[in-house]
């Protein structure tokens, strides 16, 4: 009897606990699916994905050269030592194993190709991933990217040969093509207000910068004291948590009506758009100094200023703070003066060019920090000003689907980071470090005037379609007419009769509309 009552009480208690947990889960789910809160959670998920991708990109900097030196540039050989008898005759011999350096192993080429393989595969994959994102939305590609990055990180943790590490690095490039493009496109899609979009993309850029700058000391410390696998396992665990959080917020594989989704513009059409091409060129140009300096500046510091290991290890760390400052300033300026995004980008290119030309003149670590900080400040200006401009260009010229246009942005970054590890060392060897920096600086300064081409586009207000600004024609089709009428009505003060225009009136009004 007592046992039966105890079982009954236990069942009742379990039922209450289960009911309470279910109710709490519903509340949490409801709170997470509240539109504004869900948008913020998705921003956090995307920022974590950006952080992980850039940490995985840079965490190998202090690890791989030392690890490859161990597994590839030394080979195990056996040396035979003869033992002579008392009368000088050879009685026996002994063998001992020693590590002998392999003179034929080209470490620089191996490391350069390994570093560049991620950007190369990312560059090749982006045209396809951009189209895929436009077709299926942003959540599924983001989940695919996080999954690929998880397996790439696990492979890095336990890989012991150059071939396995190369495969893991290339696999990360494929994951980045999905995660980076879909993540940035998701932010542009969720934050439609220009000032909010610029701020959200600025936050994502801050996480990208933080991941790139904090990863080398993070990886170096854990590698030295805990082993090669520890930093990669930590990153894979965070990647897993980010994927789980994404599944809690969205249901990527739930049934949905694809026929109601907007059809994005093909990526090849976006690539030949002159405005988008100018922005893409600026994104590539501004990242060339960073991509080419990362593999070469340490050796130059060692030869020129006899820099210590810790100085070379934290070379880029102080630059994180001016990068954040650049993001903050650009976001504030864009909110107050949104029509001058092109100007902020042009100023950033000039700062990058001047900083790059100044670097070879530095003779100690303290002097070097100043141009490096200015360099990252300029990059922040360019990225924060021009990434939202890509979404704006798609909004006013095409359909507001952002997968392909941010695939183009990712291609722009990948071009710089694919060429840097492979070409930078050879350029320094053939021409010199000074000539490399002067060339990069000159390219950035000369490209800045090209952003004047965006001046007229940036003057357009987000509520206007480019069809009646640049092409001087009215909206085509009933959908365009209704949208334009609604947008104009929203801009008119209360009491205006603009909301009662007929289709004919709207068409007539817009054919002669200029602002």
Curated annotation (Swiss-Prot):
Write down the membrane topology: Multi-pass membrane protein
Where is this protein chiefly located? membrane
Could you list this entry's UniProt keywords, alphabetically sorted: Glycoprotein, Membrane, Neurotransmitter transport, Transmembrane, Transmembrane helix, Transport
Its localization reads:
Membrane
Reading the lineage from the top rank, the first entry is Eukaryota
TM regions (residue ranges): 41-61, 113-133, 140-160, 170-190, 202-222, 230-250, 272-292, 311-331, 342-362, 368-388, 405-425, 433-453
Q: What is this protein called?
A: Vesicular acetylcholine transporter
Q: What species does this protein belong to? A: Tetronarce californica
């Amino acid at each position: 009897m007592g046992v039966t009552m105890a079982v009954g009480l236990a069942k009742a208690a379990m039922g209450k606990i289960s009911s309470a947990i279910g109710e709490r889960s519903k509340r949490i789910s409801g709170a997470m699916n509240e539109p504004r809160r869900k948008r913020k959670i998705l921003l956090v998920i995307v920022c974590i994905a950006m952080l992980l991708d850039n940490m995985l990109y840079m965490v190998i900097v202090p690890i791989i050269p030392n690890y490859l030196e161990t597994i590839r540039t030394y080979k195990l050989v056996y040396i035979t030592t003869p033992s002579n008898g008392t009368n000088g005759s050879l009685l026996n011999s002994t063998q001992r194993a020693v590590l002998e350096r392999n003179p034929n192993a080209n470490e620089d080429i191996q490391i350069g190709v390994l570093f560049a393989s991620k950007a190369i595969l990312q560059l090749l994959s982006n045209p396809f991933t951009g189209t895929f994102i436009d077709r299926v939305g942003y959540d599924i590609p983001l989940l695919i990217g996080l999954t690929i990055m998880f397996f790439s990180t696990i492979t890095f943790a336990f890989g012991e040969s150059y071939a396995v590490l190369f495969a893991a690095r290339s696999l990360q490039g494929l994951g980045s093509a999905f995660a980076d493009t879909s993540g940035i496109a998701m932010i542009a899609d969720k934050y439609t207000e220009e000032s909010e979009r610029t701020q959200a993309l600025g936050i994502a850029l801050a996480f990208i910068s933080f991941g790139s700058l904090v990863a080398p000391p993070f990886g170096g410390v854990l590698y030295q004291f805990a082993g090669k696998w520890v930093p990669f396992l930590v990153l894979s665990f965070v990647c897993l948590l980010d994927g789980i959080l994404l599944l809690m917020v969205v249901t990527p594989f739930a049934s949905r009506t694809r026929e109601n989704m907007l059809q994005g513009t093909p990526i090849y059409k976006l690539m030949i758009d002159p405005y988008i091409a100018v922005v893409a060129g600026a994104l590539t140009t501004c990242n060339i100094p960073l991509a080419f300096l990362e593999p070469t500046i340490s050796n130059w510091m060692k030869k020129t200023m006899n820099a210590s290991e810790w100085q070379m290890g934290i070379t880029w760390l102080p630059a994180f703070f001016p990068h954040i400052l650049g993001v903050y300033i650009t976001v504030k300026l864009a909110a107050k003066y949104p029509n001058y995004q092109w100007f902020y980008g042009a100023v950033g290119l000039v700062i990058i060019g001047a900083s790059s030309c100044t670097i070879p003149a530095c003779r100690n670590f303290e002097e070097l920090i100043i141009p490096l900080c200015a360099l990252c400040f300029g990059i922040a200006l360019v990225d924060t000003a021009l990434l939202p401009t890509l979404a704006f260009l798609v909004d006013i010229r095409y359909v507001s689907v952002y997968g392909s246009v941010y695939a183009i942005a990712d291609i722009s970054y990948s071009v710089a980071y694919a060429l840097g590890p492979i070409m930078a060392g050879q350029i320094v060897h053939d021409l010199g470090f000074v000539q490399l920096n002067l060339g990069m600086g000159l390219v950035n300064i000369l490209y800045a005037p090209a952003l004047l081409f965006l001046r007229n586009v940036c003057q357009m207000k987000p509520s206007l379609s480019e069809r009646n600004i640049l092409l001087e024609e009215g909206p085509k089709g009933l959908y365009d007419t209704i949208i334009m009428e609604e947008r104009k009505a929203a801009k008119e003060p209360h009491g205006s009769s603009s909301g009662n225009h007929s289709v004919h009136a709207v068409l007539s009004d817009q054919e002669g509309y200029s602002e």
